[in-house]
């Protein structure tokens, strides 16, 4: 198993919740202090560099118009890290290509980072979350189709080396595509795609790409992983599904004592609790399928708060959303989850969120790297999983 240190680069200094309608899209940026923002950027970059020193890989994402993720350009942050880190793989999960007007620009940016990092880039694609439809001035309908067409154009741009080509799709039309530079890794960097549903997992598996899923816990993760395994085999990729093709993201804090570990886990709950979002941003018409809307009405939305909901640490640990405690306790929690979902090869560890201090973040990273990671690396040897 590989561990990827992940932070959404949040700005936690928010007004009282009654003072704003939504934490995303419409919160006025007068609440943002650039001087504090500068310090937060320095701390997050230092933590990613420290993860690199500890032998942990790095994950970056991007979101827009929200204090919960003040990283609106994953390529910029990853370009910085390509220069200041030495060994870590650099995963962008991901580029919201359904909302990008110029997929060729994404192909160029990713190729440039891959060269700058000497082939350490892992490139993820996402269709974007619902609330970003409005700030992207994007059509909420057929976003999945737009994402895959943008993917096709990017892949062709990466792998065409004989001069310009023309691309005529349903959503994207480009003439004279001929990117410089081309990727360091040939034919292209490893590709990841996110999935929170079995349908998305099936599409990803058919292409043989890596899948990342977030905060699904014990209940929602097994169906996603099992759908991937089934489709992977049916696509003829082989009977054994590589563990390295599956990734899970949870909130993780490792302390010296159980009390310290739980205190850190409690701090990470900020990410779940500060998520006030009105329905017109949460679920724009046409974005979600009928089945997804039925699940939402049943309370099955992932990562979106119910009004008045205050997360309880023990409940979130029992769900497989938060993993915290001593090194032994965190390993046991992760091992139990690993066995329950049938195994996975990438732990996308959200080890920093909200008011968790820079010092505590680094302390947790140290325990994770030195006392938990060596045991996690032993899981799943040999590196494939049997039939689900």
Predicted regions and their residues:
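Hydrophobic faces of well-ordered beta-strands that scaffold small-molecule active sites
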Residues: 3-7, 58-60, 90-93, 121-125, ...
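Glycine-rich, proline-tolerant flexible connector loops at the mouths of alpha/beta enzymes
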Residues: 59-77, 97, 129-131, 215-216, ...
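A conserved active-site cap/scaffold subdomain adjacent to cofactor or substrate pockets
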Residues: 196-220, 224-225
